[in-house]
């Protein structure tokens, strides 16, 4: 069961909206008390599957330089004062689970006033070597975090379709995103979900919107939701641009954001399940989209 951790007076959706991937940090060290709180929080966090997962926090002065060229997009680690390494047993869907747990942790960082940025981590053994990690578990992901510098206001682009792009202003670093309206379908891929319909569920609309704000490699957002009453079906696309590992981590992050909104509004909802062998519906999905998980509200 997913345990909500935020005070009821604080809104999960606002927290998700406020989270940005920060790439510039102050040199101020993160207090040990906050690091201890993060580790404790992660160790009690829910999982999507039964898997051994561990967290290590590196806050030494030379951590950024040791990781440079080994982790991060094109080897850039953004000189953060601290780094989280999530280690996982390798089994089916372990990267999706790692993304799910990591996004939950990133939202906790945001609540604590700490900024963060996911780093690509393609070479598990090399990362473990430079960080002196002695473990048989694989590096699932690395997160840079600390006290972020305020970034200038910028233009936010929401891509509804190639010919329909909306523009708005928002503080901080914002990369173009696929709009929520382009991520959800009603019963099958031939019918876009009508968020404006008087009978549509506003909580589901918020959940899709929250998922659309989750971190995604190069903001490709390869996931799609098919909504059929109280049943949610999650599809994923593998492409030639986004590495498979980063794709699956991003999928897990989207699943967390979607689920946490539902769990904050509804009681007794089910959990994401990966066994979809009993689902026989024709979703008319493109051949490059695969049904990955289902959720019953």
Predicted regions, residues:
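Acidic, surface-exposed loops and disordered segments
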Residues: 4-297
């Amino acid at each position: 069961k997913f345990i909500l951790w935020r005070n009821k007076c604080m809104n999960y959706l606002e927290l998700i909206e406020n989270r940005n991937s920060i790439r510039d940090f102050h040199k101020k060290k993160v207090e040990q008390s906050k690091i201890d709180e993060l580790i404790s929080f992660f160790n009690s966090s829910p999982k999507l599957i039964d898997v051994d997962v561990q967290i290590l926090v590196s806050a030494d002065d030379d951590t950024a330089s040791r990781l440079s060229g080994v982790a991060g997009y094109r080897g850039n680690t953004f000189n953060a004062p601290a780094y989280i390494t999530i280690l996982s047993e390798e089994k089916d869907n372990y990267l999706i689970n790692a993304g799910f747990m990591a996004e939950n942790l990133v939202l906790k960082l945001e609540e604590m006033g700490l900024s963060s940025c996911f780093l690509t981590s393609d070479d598990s053994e090399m990362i473990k070597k430079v960080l002196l990690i002695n473990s048989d578990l694989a590096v699932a992901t690395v997160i840079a975090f600390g006290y972020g510098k305020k970034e200038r206001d910028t233009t936010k682009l929401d891509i509804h379709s190639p010919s329909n792009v909306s523009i708005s202003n928002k503080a901080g670093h914002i990369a173009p995103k696929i709009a929520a309206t382009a991520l959800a379908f009603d019963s099958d891929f031939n019918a876009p979900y009508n968020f404006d319909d008087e009978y549509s569920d506003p909580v589901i609309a918020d959940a899709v919107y929250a998922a659309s704000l989750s971190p995604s490699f190069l903001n490709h957002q390869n996931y799609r939701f098919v909504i059929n009453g109280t049943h949610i079906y999650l599809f994923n696309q593998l492409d030639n641009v986004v590495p498979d590992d980063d794709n699956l981590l991003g999928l897990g992050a989207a699943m967390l954001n979607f689920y946490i909104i539902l769990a904050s509004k509804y009681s007794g909802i089910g959990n994401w399940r990966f066994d979809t062998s009993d689902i026989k519906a024709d979703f008319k999905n493109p051949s490059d989209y695969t049904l990955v998980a289902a959720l019953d509200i």
